[in-house]
Design a protein with these regions (language model features):
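N-terminal intrinsically disordered, low-complexity regulatory domains
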Residues: 41-46, 86
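Short, electropositive alpha-helical surface patch
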Residues: 210-218
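Long, contiguous juxta-domain segments that are non-catalytic but functionally important
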Residues: 34-37, 43, 54
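Short, well-ordered amphipathic alpha-helices
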Residues: 57-63, 101-106, 213
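N-terminal low-complexity, intrinsically disordered segments
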Residues: 47-67
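Outer-membrane pore/translocation modules
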Residues: 19-38, 66-193, 198-206, 227-246
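Outer-membrane beta-barrel "beta-signal"
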Residues: 244-259
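Cleavable N-terminal export/targeting peptides
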Residues: 1-23, 258-259
Length: 259
């Protein structure tokens, strides 16, 4: 486990160094936010089974840069992995790993950006034949994300997505309207030292809204990062009818950008 974390952190450092030096295709680059944070639930007991760590690793590999001679019009393959680690529990198991590979097209629009893509997201558990059947979850969807970046540092993003998901041993739309949602709405701010973002995802499940919010303060090469999460946005195995996941508050480090 320690070896795995060492390799992951080393690779992240290499990606960050490459970004600073302006490496070109086909080098890996950071894609979505990368962080390592730890914390506790804000509801229910705090103990070795509920406290733990969360980390996210996300990279993109350019496949075709400056398509049609237009700078910034790039096609890439991306991969994001989010892990929930019950470090303090017996044997320190990973409670959930969410894997999200995809193909993405980035379209520059002056200060703004348009991102189109096809993404698969799953927790990697088999669909049939084992005791994990009841917790196998996956979604496949197209998405359209528009980000508006203002001179003041304000950032507004809308992400619309539609597809099909695997739930209760069948492909269904239920995972979208009940747990995953069809749209994400983000309000953020960035400056030389600060980054802030809050994302709301309307759903029709018990929570009514998945919320993910974070604040980062740059300190040297990294940023001190605090994150609040509420709803079904973290663990796909929490997608259970009638189940109410706990809200979490976590603190740690952010590598790169939050927005």
């Amino acid at each position: 486990m320690k070896k795995f974390l060492f390799i992951a952190l080393t690779l992240i450092s290499c990606i960050q160094a490459g970004a600073r030096e302006g490496l070109r295709s086909p080098s890996l680059c950071a894609f979505r936010p990368m962080y390592f944070i730890g914390g506790v639930p804000l509801e229910g007991p705090v103990n070795k089974s509920t406290a733990g760590f969360k980390f996210q690793f996300s990279v993109a590999l350019p496949l075709w840069k400056s398509m049609a001679g237009r700078e910034g019009l790039d096609l890439c393959f991306g991969y994001t992995q989010t892990s929930l680690w019950d470090f303090f529990d017996d044997s320190s198991p990973f409670r959930e790993n969410v894997y999200a590979p995809g193909i993405y097209l980035s379209v520059p629009l002056e200060r703004d950006n348009l991102l189109l893509g096809l993404e698969h997201k799953s927790n990697g558990r088999p669909m049939r034949g084992t005791s994990d059947d009841n917790y196998s979850r996956s979604v496949n969807y197209f998405f359209f994300e528009y980000g508006a970046f203002f001179h003041s540092g304000l950032v507004l993003k809308t992400n619309l997505h539609a597809g099909v998901g695997w739930y209760d041993e069948e492909f269904t739309q239920e995972v979208f309207w009940r747990f995953h949602g069809y749209a994400d709405f983000t309000v953020g701010y960035h400056s030389d030292k600060w980054q802030m973002a809050a994302t709301a995802t309307p759903v029709f499940g018990p929570f009514g809204m998945n919320i993910d919010a974070g604040v980062a303060r740059k300190i040297g090469s990294y940023s001190l990062f605090i994150q609040f999460n509420h709803g079904y946005g973290e663990a796909l195995s929490d997608w259970v009818r009638g189940y109410h996941p706990a809200s979490f508050l976590r603190l740690g480090i952010l590598i790169g950008n939050l927005l």
